Every structure is written in C-alpha cells, then in structure tokens.
Amino acid sequence: MSGSPVKRQRMENALDQLKQFTTVVADTGDFHAIDEYKPQDATTNPSLILAAAQMPTYQELVEEAIAYGRKLGGSQEEQITNAIDKLFVLFGAEILKKIPGRVSTEVDARLSFDKDAMVARARRLIELYKEAGISKERILIKLSSTWEGIQAGKELEEHHGIRCNMTLLFSFAQAVACAEAGVTLISPFVGRILDWHVANTDKKSYETQEDPGVKSVTKIYNYYKKFGYKTIVMGASFRNTGEIKALAGCDFLTISPQLLGELLKDHSKLTPVLSAKAAQASDLEKIQLDEKAFRWLHNEDRMAVEKLSDGIRRFAADAVKLERMLRERMFSAENGK
C-alpha cells in the first residue's frame, strides 16, 4: 500500500497543471533557458533576439549571420538585412532543436504598414529556414496586427501556405479582423494593457479577475469559441503568474522563463478558467469589419491605438540597435583588414 491520499506527495507544480489544459509556449530568444520548462512551442521577437545576441554564449551565431550577409554581398544595407534575417533564423533553428512544436519568427516591425513588403520578408524567412532544412510547418511568422499586417497574414496563409502569428494585438477590432482573415494564431497582449491602465487611470492596482488585460483576452477567447473560429488564441505579455492562472484554459499562453520558473515552484491548485463550453453562454454578438469599420473601431480604443504604436516603435528601435551592432561588427572588421 502506498499510504493514504493525505500523505501523498504535495500537489504537482502549477506549470505541469497548466499544461493539462493549455499549450505552454516559452517566450525567449535564450534557447538555453528552454530545456528546464519543456514547452511545446517558443516565440521570439526583435527585442528578445537583440538581448540574446549580446550574450557571450551566442556569439558564434552572430558570427555565422555576419558571414552569411557578407557572402551574399550587395550594398551595406543589403548585407545587414540578410545578416539579420539569417540571425533570426539561426536562433529559431536552435530553438527548434529544444521543442517538439513551432517557433515564431518576427518580420521587421518597420514594415508594419506595407503589406507587400511584409509578405516578401516572410517568404524570405521561410526560404532561409528551408535552406537550413526546416519545413514551413514548424514556423509561425509574426506580423504586427495593423490592417496591413492582417491582410499580409491572410495572403500568406491563403496563397503561400505560410502560417502566421499576429502580434501587438490590443483591441477587439484587431482580434475580429484576424479571425476573419483566417490566420493560424493571434497573440493578444495582457501585461501591456495593464501597464497602460495603471499609467493612464486613477486605478493603480487590480484584482486578477478585474485586470483589463485578462478581461481583454477572455473576451477575445469567448468570441472566437462562440462563433467557431479556428484561429488559436495565445495570451502573451504577462506581468505576474496571477494573470496566467486567470487565463488557464486559453488555447496557448506564451510565458517568459522568469514566470515559467515561478510556476514551477508554485504548488497551489490550478483549475481551468476559460473553456469553449462556457464561451457559448457569453452575450457577445458577431460583428464583421471591412477596412473602414476596422479603422474606426480600433481608433475608438485609445489604449489599443497607443499601445500598438508604442509596440511598433519599440520593436523598430530594437531592430535599429541590432542593425547598428551588426554594422559595427561587419564593417569595422572589414576596415581593419
């Protein structure tokens, strides 16, 4: 006999409990941080790649990307662009060695208002993965959830069989447009919505169930499930484990290594909060959005307008920093020959 149930080992950790009803994704470019948490998928963005590219442990990848950019030749700008694309793919390829599922690789945020340029850059990234022996089935291309980005996602999915992850998603309008575009996955942000409300309203703290980021993702999840959209809802950008627990049951959640570590040490009981069944009871009504209606509805949400703009600027700024870093490495070395 193994003894009474009371004497059993303490409850399994919150991360393992969460994995029973939500697909857990690691939000990091630091692939050495992934092993411990055994996520299904992983997501990267320009800021995470910039941070990882500055770590001593990843300098071989940076050197390989620089060599690739040089080998293809062309102008300095072309060499740097090719080196950056290669760097993103090198990190993605290493991450894929650690996970069974897919990695998300982001298109340069400076293209966020140029549909055709986003499509071209996405296809280029997929081509680079193919050169590395990785099929497009294991890649999600991340695009900003501007109107142009959403239409780029629609084109990539329908005409090129390239799966997309729509990021920087803050408004219900963005979520509805993504569902109608038939993209594979959306990443509605939680923590950045909370940040905005703390900074711009008199209320400085929230109970988890009243957290505006949690409420936003809950509404989007319920809408998608109620109306039968196949697009995966992946909550992103968390400030604490309370937000994660409040969204247990969501299709996917992408979580930083720091918060994955906290969940690993947490042995409190976790129960699913979101479910497709409960979503059927929500009082949401179906809406359809053409471009004009999308722009109006999104523009009515001050938080979403400000956070989308801010998010694009931040990712663009980190892309510029990455370019500067590679330019110094590529061309100062060349000048010193």
From Swiss-Prot:
Keyword annotations: Acetylation, Cytoplasm, Pentose shunt, Phosphoprotein, Schiff base, Transferase
UniProt record, GO biological process: carbohydrate metabolic process; pentose-phosphate shunt, non-oxidative branch
Keyword Transmembrane: no
Cellular location(s): Cytoplasm
Enzyme kind, highest EC tier: transferase
InterPro entries: Aldolase_TIM, TAL/FSA, Transaldolase_1, Transaldolase_AS
Pathway field: Carbohydrate degradation; pentose phosphate pathway; D-glyceraldehyde 3-phosphate and beta-D-fructose 6-phosphate from D-ribose 5-phosphate and D-xylulose 5-phosphate (non-oxidative stage): step 2/3
N6-acetyllysine modification, residue list: K115, K219, K269, K286, K321
GO CC, alphabetical: cytoplasm; nucleus
One protein family per Pfam: TAL_FSA
Example of a GO MF term: transaldolase activity
Active site: K142 (schiff-base intermediate with substrate)
Alphabetized CDD domains for the sequence: Transaldolase_TalAB
Subunit text: Homodimer.
Family per record: Belongs to the transaldolase family. Type 1 subfamily.
Name of the protein in question: Transaldolase
Organism of this sequence: Bos taurus (Bovine)
Gene: TALDO1
